UniProtKB/Swiss-Prot annotation:
Residues 456-478 are annotated as: Disordered. Residues 457-478 have a biased composition (Low complexity). One of its GO terms (biological process) is lipid storage. Keywords: Cell membrane, Cytoplasm, Glycoprotein, Hydrolase, Isopeptide bond, Lipid degradation, Lipid droplet, Lipid metabolism, Membrane, Phosphoprotein, Signal-anchor, Transmembrane, Transmembrane helix, Ubl conjugation. It comes from Rattus norvegicus. There is a cross-link at K92 (Glycyl lysine isopeptide (Lys-Gly) (interchain with G-Cter in ubiquitin)). A motif (DGA/G) lies at residues 166-168. This is Patatin-like phospholipase domain-containing protein 2. It is a multi-pass membrane protein. Induction: Increased by rosiglitazone in subcutaneous and visceral white adipose tissue.
Amino acid sequence: MFPRETKWNISFAGCGFLGVYHIGVASCLREHAPFLVANATHIYGASAGALTATALVTGACLGEAGANIIEVSKEARKRFLGPLHPSFNLVKTIRGCLLKTLPADCHTRASGRLGISLTRVSDGENVIISHFSSKDELIQANVCSTFIPVYCGLIPPTLQGVRYVDGGISDNLPLYELKNTITVSPFSGESDICPQDSSTNIHELRITNTSIQFNLRNLYRLSKALFPPEPMVLREMCKQGYRDGLRFLRRNGLLNQPNPLLALPPVVPQEEDAEEAAVTEERTGGEDRILEHLPARLNEALLEACVEPKDLMTTLSNMLPVRLATAMMVPYTLPLESAVSFTIRLLEWLPDVPEDIRWMKEQTGSICQYLVMRAKRKLGDHLPSRLSEQVELRRAQSLPSVPLSCATYSEALPNWVRNNLSLGDALAKWEECQRQLLLGLFCTNVAFPPDALRMRAPASPTATDPATPQDPSGLPPC
């Protein structure tokens, strides 16, 4: 129940091809609680949820939207690699379906109420776009929100000059944390409208704000989000969404209320039992009645999806020999189909080539600059320490060995070595002192007296000393 002063939002989670579940929920809300959609402050969506939110806000035919999802899934299943086949262009298909389904004034209806979750490529931050200037801009916002990198292509699309990718990467369920937000998700968990699995596992997996209970059914749903299941499975998911929407409305007292802004009176126990019985009847034998309440276009699409065409070509293609021959010819037909689809995409890409090439050059330069800066940072952290260790080790090995047992150890080093605080200066002065000591060892100072080199005259024979012995020959000394 919603009082007069209460405001509420509706948020649809991204889920790939399981978006047909959102179509069932939206059909239930539009049929049984139109006030809930009309009076909602904002209706948010991410990825496939953005497509349903756009259809719900702009008043587009939900039956046609559901039929488009089923047709796209059938086209993807026809190919050998499914959505990954080169000839399957999901972005082009989504754009064509939106152009055909949305009304001409869709951007006027959506501005201010619709919120599309996007992921900005430059920094990975989440952005919610709520204002649109034209129908093409609204369609481009949906294309950006559903663009899964590598799965849909390598070059992300542009909106208002900025590159965006799938909004589910950064925020798959916008504004889920607000208590007044009605959250819708095809995965069983803690969302307001979601499947109620009977698993007793209490563990949950939270992926970008989306609560997913850890059980086998959710694992199966996750596996079919990007690779579409059979049309019968999609039909059951749409019915499941319709049932879960009815359960939410009944549990909150919003089913078929003429004035929901007024508080509802308390419900007596007998009425609660009657409501529980109605829920049980709805679950057991009400599937046919549910199909009657679905939009006519969606009901027709669901019925057609369960019936195989009976023409001759379909019958021949389903025969076992033809299927075996087709599988054996895949190595030859796949390169040819890839070449044709590549040529077509290249021709369609020509108008955007200059802008995309410029963007790729900028991204390549940014990546290279980031790698260079990171390498410089790592080298700057390791090289100085390694070099200083090697220099200190080399200088330490060149020092003279001084025995530690020397009693006069303090006298072995000069005062400038003991008092210096810098090891490098001490080593430099020690080497200088060592060179001076070596020069002192190999240099000898010879001192001559002043008269050492003076010539002396010989002594006369008459002035001989009597104590000096005379030569017996009587000859004078030489």
